[in-house]
UniProtKB/Swiss-Prot annotation:
It comes from Thermococcus kodakarensis (strain ATCC BAA-918 / JCM 12380 / KOD1) (Pyrococcus kodakaraensis (strain KOD1)). Pathway: Amine and polyamine biosynthesis. CDD domains: AdoMet_MTases. HAMAP family: Aminopropyltransf_BpsA. This is N(4)-bis(aminopropyl)spermidine synthase. Disruption phenotype: Grows at 85 degrees Celsius with a slightly longer lag phase, but is unable to grow at 93 degrees Celsius. Coiled coil: none annotated. Gene3D superfamilies: Vaccinia Virus protein VP39 (3.40.50.150), Winged helix-like DNA-binding domain superfamily/Winged helix DNA-binding domain (1.10.10.10). One of its GO terms (cellular component) is cytoplasm. GO terms for biological process: polyamine biosynthetic process.
Amino acid sequence: MREIIERVKEKTTIPVYERTIENVLSAIQASGDVWRIVDLSEEPLPLVVAVVTALYELGYVAFENNQVILTRKGKELVEKYGIGPRADYTCSHCQGRTVEIDAFSELLEQFKEITRDRPEPAHQFDQAYVTPETTVARVALMHSRGDLENKEVFVLGDDDLTSVALMLSGLPKRIAVLDIDERLTKFIEKAADEIGYENIEIFTFDLRKPLPDYALHKFDTFITDPPETVEAIRAFVGRGIATLKGPGCAGYFGITRRESSLDKWREIQRVLLNEFGVVITDIIRNFNEYVNWGYVEETRAWRLLPIKVKPSYNWYKSYMFRIQTLEGSKGFEDEITVGQELYDDEESSTT
């Protein structure tokens, strides 16, 4: 195992552990699909590629018919270490989200109809939207936690069009939406007119800039889906916290294992707990399921993959975090001067 770890370290600066190798070997036994291996192993895609490449170079795996398979040497390795195939027992009813959306079936159909001509994801803004079922499940989750009804809700970045589902629910007292992409803000304005929802404010805005006064300390709840760098957590989640009125308010956002190692998770959680002074109340595994975006062949993931095959299912998922403010919690109000680093780091793959 040490030989494999050392070979992986030659290929990436992402931290690698014996558990990393075990996770990838376990996933390979469950599926030869490279996207599914990333999904099941729950390691950052660039790290999975480094591990698979090292295993290939050392003779533990082979590539056949666009699949990753264990060689005889690889089978002997997993038997030696007692590594079996990764099992998946996700609830087939709620898809592991812990909320069911049957009560929102009419809202779901309305949402699908209104968003059928939505703007396609823009690669330059690291956009990728979730499935309609995920968006509606967000409404169900937020409502179940007491964070929607008669609340003022801020949406920071909305390629998922969560604001549209919120309008259809009729639950919030007021909604505000910020997004850097004018295509999205115009689409949301059009949807608001179609729905007849008036208590919404929509702005085209770059979150690297400090929020204007009209957005600070005015809201009960925020939701955002940030790029997965520590700077992006400050820009999106930190800005979200800055919109909240005070203690007892809530924020929602997604973080993946596909582009964030547990080492990065630790740094993100340090920012949340130590810099922002909030508490994490919920982390729901693979809550957010993303529709495969049309620019996959333009991404770093495609350049890295040893097997060039498009994903056949929605492989990209993120954990849903819920945070709550306490006495002394504070957001991030300074200007962020980074450029592309807002979207990219060593663990990124969808940019």
